[in-house]
Amino acid sequence: MLHDDGDASVFVNRDLVEPDTIIDEERIVGRDEQLESVVSFLKPTLQGNRPPNMLLYGPAGTGKSLIIGAVTQQIIELCHSKGERFGVVQVNCQPINTLDQAVYELVQTVASDVGIEPGVPETGVSTKRKYRRLYDLINEHYDSVIFILDEIDLLVGRRANDEPAYSKLLYQLSRASNTNDIEGQVSVAALTNDPKFMENIDGRAESSFNPRDIYFPDYDATQLRQILENRRDAFRQDALTDDVLPLVSAFAAQSHGDARKAIDLFRGAGDLADEQGDQTVREDHVRESQDEIDKDRSLKLIAGLTTQKKISLYATAAVAHCSSATRNSVPSPVGFQVYQWVTEEIDADQMTRETYVKYVKELSTYGLVSTARKSRGRGGGMYMDFTFRGDPESMMHRVVDDTRLERVGTESERLHAVVNAQLREFEE
């Protein structure tokens, strides 16, 4: 039976170690310049004027969502005190595959915020109708609005040679006020890890979006430690052993200064202590939490991939795992040949070599692989070399939840033969 054992928990305010919790300005570390920029850019909203669009870019876990969230929350409260309705429509684009899905997600977000049904089905109607519903909801419930599009660079769309879905979305949203689709003031904030994001959008979208740039660098080790210190009161006063904070900071520093990972690890260690009935959080809880986070993260990322991206990942991992010579790197020509074999085995659509390489390169943004451009020597041309950051066999196992790929998993001997034949041909 369930019972209230809150007094036994190592936490007193667990929300403080939830990465999406909007925290007080006093707890923000190392982001004074970025905070001042966002405040300055959004301040016109309070005077009824249109703020500029913004591009917040920098590595993962560097405070982009934190800063934009903290400032927009303040604006919501200030507008509310004046009887004005400021809407914050925020979506994460990572799990969204198409423009149509993105527009529906925006509709759902607004509807949820104002407590009504979306009023349009997810499928069976045009994207244009979904845009219309989005604009109607905003006009009815908000006086001004900001769209926050997190991880926007991952909203690519399905057609490899078409304008990216994120480019089309930015074009429509950034001009919605000028076209009178939205009656109030509109601002768009795009958040991305990609410093070259603007190079890939259509000229019309670039002109319409025309953002103010705000760069977020990695946190250094001292800043990571201070971020954790500022959330230490999430735990009971004597619940942390002395080695917990330094170890969490060290793990986070290894992840290139990712504060989100540091906070996830901090919280996970506390959760493990609670689950095991311990009154203090120790080093072993931190290490176990780190192992679980690595596994959970890759599982979630892989589960969210499209079937074609799963096939690309599976084929590439198979080269690293099935090679008769121990190797962790995969030449793209070999990976593509194995990809072709896999698609034939499961009767799936077959993408071009360029699309295959593009899909595997995308996996580097998730931290699953790293990429390097290499040469085959004089006259041999260039190719991409993919190196797995985790165990390739584990990646394969995590992909085979796609039922069609399970069939390939049963053909272990044939898969090994195909991989090694292609490697021999490449190396000749």
UniProtKB/Swiss-Prot annotation:
Q: Which SUPFAM superfamilies match?
A: P-loop containing nucleoside triphosphate hydrolases, Winged helix' DNA-binding domain
Q: Does the keyword Transport apply?
A: no
- Record note on disruption phenotype: Not essential for normal growth.
Q: Name one GO molecular function term.
A: ATP binding
Q: One Pfam family, please name it.
A: AAA_16
**Does Protein biosynthesis appear among the keywords?**
no
GO biological process terms held by the UniProt record: DNA replication
Q: Which UniProt keywords apply?
A: ATP-binding, DNA replication, Nucleotide-binding, Plasmid
Please tell me where ATP binds in this chain.
T62, G63, K64, S65, L66, Y219, R231
Similarity comment:
Belongs to the CDC6/cdc18 family.
NCBIfam families this protein is in?
A: orc1/cdc6 family replication initiation protein (TIGR02928)
Function of the protein: Involved in regulation of DNA replication.
Could you tell me what this protein is called?
A: ORC1-type DNA replication protein 5
Organism equals: Halobacterium salinarum (strain ATCC 700922 / JCM 11081 / NRC-1) (Halobacterium halobium)
